[in-house]
């Protein structure tokens, strides 16, 4: 059964009050990294109900842009140094209003892939004749027959990271609920994160590994032969393993540490690479308080890119056979080591992009980005639907809050297993559900 989304005439939302204009704001070294400046991040947030959400959100965006006025500008390289920057033009944010001829439950709340409504119908499309990479932020609000709605965004990753996205969307929600100012005051200060001098750049080269036993991911039009699956992980069981780690090691670990260790081991066992083949687990660490500790107020506010990838590497046999607490220790020690470095060293730690292989795995924790706190007056989102990140990193996994409000469990969604390994992977993960 097919469903139709009807988009009304799009509009440009400008700040509701005069804002600084006519000047150029620099982006940081992180913001200007090549793989971020050409990365448009698509996200759908699913809400259960709302009264005229498009009207409310449109007005809230105009108010939020007074505080986040760079988002009303345009990305440009027409500067003295030719570097990517934000021109504060005040032109506004592209906003699309739409209606769907179905209920949320008819399309499974957009939780099953492939989506029952093509993502292009839910996401905002850029104006004809406009380069989408010049637009920092676009929005589409789609109302469903049941009263639910989606708040879908397309954002240029060069302007803000996941934490920044959460901060901005929370601010829009606060404006929608009648606040005069965002709870967290936005901070720009991109010039603090400068390009490192050559001596600060890590010279670490990728470790040689036996590629002959690693399956081809078969990239075709940004798609792979990777299967999608999800698990609802028991927080009681995770807390039991945290207690076991504390008893064995004498230190405290996080829910994330335990899930990441279990995921890495389960997948490594399921794919069955040669014991000496190197496998990796990558996740992002927020380094705001290290790099910007002299610039930020106590409540933060920096919304530029300030997440660095931490790549954990080990032989397949070690990860498959070690006690789980040892893998937790490996992950935790790597985090502690990275965060103990000084600002200059951290800025130089950004590894070059490389095409991922089946031996590589990444995990993103969407629970801690602030997105669940984006409340436009009717409560936070029921579901988050990231649409394109797994097509970039291939073997990706995501942590979400449980969709059942009364439960404290964690939902893990994975795009990291080919079909022939899926059953073994599920068997390994089942004792966490």
Swiss-Prot record:
Gene3D superfamilies: Chloramphenicol acetyltransferase-like domain (3.30.559.10). InterPro entries: CAT-like_dom_sf (IPR023213), Plant_acyltransferase (IPR050898). This is Myricetin 3-O-glucosyl 1,2-rhamnoside 6'-O-caffeoyltransferase AT2. Pathway: Flavonoid metabolism. Caffeoyltransferase involved in montbretin A (MbA) biosynthesis. Catalyzes the caffeoylation of myricetin 3-O-beta-D-glucosyl 1,2-alpha-L-rhamnoside (MRG) to produce myricetin 3-O-(6'-O-caffeoyl)-beta-D-glucosyl 1,2-alpha-L-rhamnoside (mini-MbA), a precursor of MbA. Mini-MbA and MbA are potent inhibitors of human pancreatic alpha-amylase and are being developed as drug candidates to treat type-2 diabetes. In vitro, is able to catalyze the caffeoylation of quercetin 3-O-sophoroside (QGG), although QGG may not be a physiological substrate in vivo. The active site is at 157 (proton acceptor), 375 (proton acceptor). It is an enzyme of class 2 (transferase). Keywords: Acyltransferase, Transferase. Belongs to the plant acyltransferase family. It comes from the Eukaryota. One of its GO terms (molecular function) is acyltransferase activity. Its EC number is 2.3.1.-.
């Amino acid at each position: 059964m097919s469903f139709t989304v009807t988009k009304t005439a799009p509009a440009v939302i400008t700040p509701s009050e005069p804002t600084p204009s006519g000047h150029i704001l620099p982006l940081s070294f992180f913001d200007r990294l090549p793989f971020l400046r050409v990365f448009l991040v698509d996200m759908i947030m699913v809400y259960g109900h709302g009264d005229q959400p498009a009207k409310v959100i449109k007005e809230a965006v105009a108010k939020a842009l007074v505080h986040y006025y760079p988002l009303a500008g345009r990305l440009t390289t027409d500067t003295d140094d030719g570097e990517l920057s934000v021109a504060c033009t005040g032109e506004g944010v592209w906003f699309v209003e739409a209606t769907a001829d179905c209920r949320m439950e008819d399309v499974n709340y957009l939780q099953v892939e492939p989506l029952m409504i093509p993502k292009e119908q839910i996401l905002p499309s850029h104006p004809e004749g406009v380069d989408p990479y010049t637009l920092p932020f676009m929005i589409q609000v789609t109302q469903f027959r049941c009263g639910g709605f989606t708040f879908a965004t397309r954002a240029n990753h060069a302007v803000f990271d996941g934490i920044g996205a959460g901060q901005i969307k929370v601010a829009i929600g606060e404006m929608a609920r009648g606040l005069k100012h965002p709870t967290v005051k936005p901070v720009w200060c991109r010039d603090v994160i400068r390009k490192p001098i050559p001596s600060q750049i890590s010279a670490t080269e990728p470790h040689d590994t036996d590629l002959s036993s690693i399956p081809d991911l078969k990239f075709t039009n940004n798609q792979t032969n990777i299967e999608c699956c999800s698990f609802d992980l028991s927080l009681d069981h995770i807390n039991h393993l945290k207690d076991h780690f504390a008893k064995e090691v004498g230190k405290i670990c996080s829910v994330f540490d335990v899930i990441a260790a279990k995921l890495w081991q389960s997948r490594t066992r399921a794919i069955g690479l040669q014991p000496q083949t190197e496998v990796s687990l990558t996740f992002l660490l927020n380094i705001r308080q290290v790099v910007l500790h002299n610039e930020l107020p106590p409540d933060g506010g920096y919304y530029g890119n300030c997440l660095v990838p931490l790549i954990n590497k080990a032989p397949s046999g070690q990860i498959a056979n070690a006690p789980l607490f040892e893998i937790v220790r490996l992950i935790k020690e790597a985090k502690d080591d990275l965060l103990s470095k000084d600002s200059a060293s951290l800025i130089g730690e950004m590894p070059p992009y490389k095409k991922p292989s089946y031996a590589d795995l990444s995990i993103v924790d969407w629970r801690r980005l602030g997105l669940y706190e984006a409340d436009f007056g009717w409560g936070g989102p029921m579901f988050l639907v990231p649409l394109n990140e797994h097509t970039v990193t291939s073997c990706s996994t995501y942590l979400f809050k449980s969709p059942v409000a009364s439960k404290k469990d964690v939902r893990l969604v994975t795009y990291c297993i080919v079909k022939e390994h899926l059953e073994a992977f599920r068997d390994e993960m089942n004792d966490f559900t």
